[in-house]
Amino acid sequence: SPAFNSWG
C-alpha cells in the first residue's frame, strides 16, 4: 500500500 510503503 502506497500509504504504508513506497513499493506496494
Curated annotation (Swiss-Prot):
Q: Which GO terms describe its cellular component?
A: extracellular region
**Location of this chain's protein in the cell:** Secreted
Broad class of the protein's primary localization: secreted
**A Pfam family this protein belongs to?**
Kinin
Glycine amide, modified sites: 8
Keyword Secreted recorded: yes
- What does the entry give for GO biological process? neuropeptide signaling pathway
Q: Does the keyword Metal-binding apply?
A: no
Provide this UniProt record's keywords sorted from A to Z. Amidation, Neuropeptide, Secreted
Instruction: Spell out the InterPro entries in the cross-references.
Output: Kinin_peptide (IPR013202)
On the tree of life, the source organism's domain of life is Eukaryota
Q: What does this protein do?
A: Mediates visceral muscle contractile activity (myotropic activity).
Query: Hey, which family's this protein in?
Result: Belongs to the kinin family.
Q: What is this protein called?
A: Kinin-5
Gene source species: Periplaneta americana
